[in-house]
Amino acid sequence: MQKLFIVLLLFCILRLDAEVDGRRATFCKQPGCQEACKKENKNGRCVDKFDNNFSYNICRCY
């Protein structure tokens, strides 16, 4: 049971702050993005944004 807890904890930490060649990646979840944009009567989509050495995956409403 303790091993399972440690594995889940590490999975959550790595998922929230992934390091790839010095770039931090943030994760956008499509269902959550669509729900947030529905309030504005728009369609939501996860898109990649690049800023200096960082790459972000963010939600955009169209």
UniProtKB/Swiss-Prot annotation:
Annotated site residue numbers, Basic residue of the functional dyad: R45
CC terms in the record's Gene Ontology section: extracellular region
Site (Aromatic residue of the functional dyad): Y62
GO MF terms held by the record: potassium channel regulator activity; toxin activity
Job of this protein: May block potassium channels.
UniProt comment concerning the protein's domains: Has the structural arrangement of an alpha-helix connected to antiparallel beta-sheets by disulfide bonds (CS-alpha/beta).
Protein name: Potassium channel toxin alpha-KTx Tx773
